């Protein structure tokens, strides 16, 4: 077939350790068509700065203008000294988890929805728990403190483990929050009829009238 040159079965070059498979290098001459055999022609890779350099066959000469080579896309250069990542992954042993990681996974499994205790201790009660445990850890252990304060042992454990201490500004904010919480609980219990209604500035009980007192009907107290 005119215009077609068949290269040897195995073609090597010192610049590239990859052997080139049999392929058909075609001419770009106008009179030639790109006839090729799919069983022999492989993917075309342009090599500009490295690798084997082959030019197009033009009038029986090699042109240096364009460089190309035919090689399989699956043939990748692998160094014989490079380790196999799959073999290393199989040989590496699984290291044991640290104690804090084991405990964290156990708590996450136990409290799937997060830590949300039904009962919360006030800041004064928390300081009392720490002080009692500091004075006599054997007598005031975690189960004893949990039974005394009517909370779970996990809550006592978290209180004793925590090293965070609030500043003076934070203590003032916490005091205000707990005052509001106390009023909210009192209002809820008063709605249930367990406690009398709390007297607030907006409550009608605060603006008492002394209708019951003689001589001062209709006047505020």
UniProtKB/Swiss-Prot annotation:
Residues 191-201 have a biased composition (Basic and acidic residues). Residues 71-100, 191-221 are annotated as: Disordered. Residues 71-81 have a biased composition (Polar residues). Transmembrane segments: none annotated. It comes from the Eukaryota. It is found in: Mitochondrion. Belongs to the RRG9 family. Required for respiratory activity and maintenance and expression of the mitochondrial genome. This is Required for respiratory growth protein 9, mitochondrial.
């Amino acid at each position: 077939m005119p215009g077609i040159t068949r290269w040897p079965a195995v073609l090597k070059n010192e610049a590239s350790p990859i052997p080139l498979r049999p392929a058909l290098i075609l001419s770009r001459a106008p009179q030639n068509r790109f006839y090729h055999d799919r069983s022999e022609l492989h993917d075309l890779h342009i090599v500009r700065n490295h690798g084997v350099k082959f030019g197009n066959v033009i009038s029986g000469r090699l042109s240096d203008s364009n460089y190309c080579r035919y090689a399989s896309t699956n043939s990748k250069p692998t160094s014989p000294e490079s380790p196999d990542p799959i073999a290393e992954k199989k040989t590496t042993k699984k290291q044991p988890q640290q104690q804090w990681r084991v405990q964290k996974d156990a708590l996450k499994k136990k409290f799937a929805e997060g830590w949300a205790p039904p009962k919360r201790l006030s800041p004064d009660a928390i300081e009392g728990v720490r002080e009692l445990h500091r004075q006599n850890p054997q007598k005031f252990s975690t189960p004893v403190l949990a039974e005394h304060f009517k909370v779970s042992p996990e809550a006592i454990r978290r209180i004793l483990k925590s090293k965070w201490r609030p500043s003076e500004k934070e203590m003032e904010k916490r005091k205000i929050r707990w005052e509001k919480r106390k009023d909210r609980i009192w209002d809820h219990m008063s709605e249930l009829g367990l406690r009398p209604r709390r007297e607030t500035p907006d409550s009608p009980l605060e603006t008492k009238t002394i209708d019951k007192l003689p001589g001062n009907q209709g006047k505020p107290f």
